[in-house]
């Protein structure tokens, strides 16, 4: 039985303004997720996802296609109207504006996403993909320690995730996963939540997912978790997006 793809729509004002987000979206596994991005500004596309232009101030802000998940980026009124009026099981608004009013038609509102979803330009250009989450002290990378230390000198501790049989939401972070923790970081709860993105969206159960290599943090010698089996596509979609939200900003979404 062939499993249906997750259908994801992203609404933006323009592709240049949300480059970091789109770089992540562009790396989603196209075998699992079908991505449509709608922009209010004209563009020259270099991305592999479907990219569409939509004009402002249409009489009806309506996309005649249904999605599992709809995401609106920013506070642009036309972007928000398009997202609200598109049929979807889950609607999410990502906003960096603290004064934004509440939108009851969105299932979740995530704030200050630009500080928490990041692709390092320097490493990206050298084909060394890195994702930095939660604060400047935590880095997730598929690079080996020696290569990353060439770019970031003050990393002290290495946390290794075992290789998975399946790909996680960010499919470009493949094979061996590493988390590098700079000295002085005490927010271990948030750090551990980074692991859960890759550990909880799978349909099969896993145990002993995380092995931790460190001397100072010997209290965290082992961290075990099992992914819950997902019985239907709808709950599978929500599980993916919930973990996506946790990775971006666990504290600030509503």
Where are these regions (language model features)?
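A charged, aromatic-enriched C-terminal amphipathic alpha-helix characteristic of glycosyltransferases
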Residues: 218-254
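N-terminal pre-catalytic "stem/leader" segment of glycosyltransferase-like enzymes
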Residues: 1-67
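Catalytic core of nucleotide-activated saccharide and alditol-phosphate transferases
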Residues: 64, 79-135
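Short His-centered aromatic/hydrophobic patch
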Residues: 73-77
